[in-house]
Curated annotation (Swiss-Prot):
Region (G5): 174-176
Species name: Xylella fastidiosa (strain Temecula1 / ATCC 700964)
Gene designation: tufA
Protein name: Elongation factor Tu
Cellular location(s): Cytoplasm
EC class (word): hydrolase
Amino acid sequence: MAQDKFKRTKLHVNVGTIGHVDHGKTTLTAALTKVGAERFGGEFKAYDAIDAAPEEKARGITISTAHVEYETEVRHYAHVDCPGHADYVKNMITGAAQMDGAILVCSAADGPMPQTREHILLARQVGVPYIVVFLNKADMVDDAELLELVEMEVRELLSKYDFPGDDTPIVRGSALKALEGDQSEIGVPAIIRLAEALDTHIPNPERAIDRPFLMPVEDVFSISGRGTVVTGRIECGVIKVGDEVEIVGIRPTSKTIVTGVEMFRKLLDQGQAGDNAGLLLRGTKRDEVERGQVLAKPGCIKAHKEFEAEVYVLSKEEGGRHTPFFNGYTPQFYMRTTDITGKVCLPEGVEMVMPGDNVKVTVSLINPVAMGEGQRFAIREGGRTVGAGVVSKVIG
């Protein structure tokens, strides 16, 4: 019982391993749980248990992901590891496993490979804010100069995608040696150094409740004698009776005052992130607000029609399209609580997009929707999901 209590006093941070196939992501994940369990308690998860990752669904897409946890002196980490490259792409784009930071695993023997580059680019596109590097298999490289060279290459690659390459912590070690209990510099001590790098380089994540208030509108009712009530799940922040909010998206932005906050038919002084609430709006008519808009703290979010996005297109086996799509493709984009039709513009030199591909696209919606960078969405045709995406840049 006491242990449960103790756990919750540590700050919770979400991380994950990224990097090229066979560079040792899963071995490192196992090593982190082993060293963490030995030093701070918790459960050791063996390689095989992590590798047999269960399938889960996120936004209609099946992804294999292994979830493990471990502790350091000051934090409790929830860590995701994916068995296949396609699972990484899907995981990062759907935000199924939101990461406060990532551990880039790169083999010292091979140096950066195509997926190393692709995962760094994806991390940049989908808004993974911090990266720490583990240079794995350091026992396979005798030449110190070669290690320096690989480290330099990794730093250059990070800088190329706007991560602070020169200031990123790079820990050299061998995940396998650490798993075997090796106490030399590249064994267990390397894992301890990596854990310390996570603690110091990844800042404390901002909690949803500390961000400005935002609630997507799910339903609108008119209550006679009281006015218009808007219901939804508060995404972030806190709302109090008397607060001014903006109604953003679909039509021109307007302002109103919240005159009541209800949960489970009880009146409250305030609602906060995670609450399913009904907000009573002063002087707002039933037809002036609709599903798909958001209520937000004034000035914190704007509506946009055009944006760039990183998208993953479902394969036929996943229940997606059976045929490719071309420039000018117009599906529906499901953002927060509504479908909005939009037109897809492919990058120069890309003729078509096949089911199973991931690609950067530009989208023009028919109506403006409240969004910012990092906003997740599903791509749908006739009510079925055919893809998933994340806004990487707002244009207009």
